[in-house]
Amino acid sequence: MSRPVNLRPWQAQALEKFTVSDVDFLAVATPGAGKTTFALAAALSDIAADPRRRLIVVAPTAHLKAQWAQAAARFGLHLDPEWASASDGLPVDMHGIVVTYQQVAISAPALARVSRGAFAIFDEIHHAGDERSWGDALQAAFGPAARRLSLSGTPFRSDTNAIPFVRYVGDEAEPDFEYGYGDALADGKVVRPVFFPRTDGRMEWTGADGVVRSATFADQLDATGSSQRLRTALSLHGEWLTAVLDAAHARLIDTRRVQADAGG
């Protein structure tokens, strides 16, 4: 099962910290940095040390269950994305399973039985705070797990529903390892720079009172005026949106003269 894994520097650093961590570990890494690879490398290392260890991945959607199973297979880890609570334990011919947070909410007792001593990965853990019942179910289902690795693409807070297995400072989740967009950009070949140009323009619309009004985005308006201005700007029948798209297209063509793969 074990095979060489080429890790980016941040993944190797995170894996080193994870190896000496306690039961729970939260890794926050910018989208596209390779959270899945890091998590599977951590699981592979842990399972190599204890071949009896089973792996359970919790993903946000059914589509991502299949993606996780495919990614794990490239590491020599075979996960069942079709597991159901009616199943009698974990499949004996697999290393583990992939479920969704919704499945956890309705199958916590069954998962608690199979998660004892297991390695659990929570993908986009902030989803567990979407509903109070999801967080409670996650706690019940994976309290018996031996190791719990939580992943997120961005720092998050929980104003109302605290997420289990996550350490907080005030309302802010405290990651054990963080790799931000700036870090990834500085490393090169991890993420690409993103450019957000500001675009102004003058919008003209007729209010409910029949009065014709005009304003740019720089003008201060009340809530009603701001809403009307935005609707006017985004109207498919107006001129502003077309002008913005034309300008963006021209800017992209110009950028591609020096960076051929810009914008795609």
Please place each PLM-identified region on the residue numbering:
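Conserved pre-motif I regulatory segment
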Residues: 1-28
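Interdomain helical connector at the RecA1-RecA2 junction of SF1/SF2 helicase-like NTPases
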Residues: 2, 160-263
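Pre-Walker A (Motif I) flank of P-loop NTPase domains
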Residues: 21-27, 53, 95, 262-264
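Hydrophobic positions in the central parallel beta-sheet of the AAA+
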Residues: 27, 97-99, 120
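Conserved Walker A/P-loop ATP-binding site and its immediately adjacent core
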Residues: 31-46, 51-74
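Conserved nucleotide-binding/hydrolysis micro-motifs of P-loop NTPases
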Residues: 62-64, 102-105, 126-127, 154-158, ...
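Inter-Walker segment of RecA-like/P-loop motor cores
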Residues: 72-110
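SF2 helicase catalytic motif II
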Residues: 101, 111-157
